[in-house]
Amino acid sequence: MPKTVIIERVQTGVRLEKRLLKVLKGLADTKDITLGDLLEGIVLHAFEGKAPFGRETLKTITDLKKIHGLDLTAASSHLLSEKPR
């Protein structure tokens, strides 16, 4: 069994696209982990150029995207702009 790594977490206020957050929360719920744990895993995999999700999880993500109307893709990431308040 892998050795546990002790870390220090900090609270942060991050703004995310509304539908993206719903998908992330839904995915975290299906994995029975916190949103923070999910985000840490995604980022750590990305930092090493590794895919964070397997085929089954990608299917779950596709389903959650449909449920929440999320049509954004990786190509959208550099094009996002907020509506003026």
Name every feature range the model reports, one short phrase each.
Residues 1-18, 25-28, 69-75, 82-85:
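Short Lys/Arg-rich basic patches
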Residues 6-7, 33, 42, 61-67:
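Weak global preference for isoleucine
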Residues 16-21, 36-39:
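Extended hydrophobic secondary-structure segments
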Residues 24-25, 47:
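Activation segment
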Residues 29-32, 37, 63, 71:
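Acidic-enriched, low-complexity/disordered segments with a strong bias for Aspartate over Glutamate
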Residues 31-58:
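Short, basic amphipathic alpha-helical segments that act as recognition/interaction helices
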Residues 48-85:
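Short, positively charged interaction helices/loops
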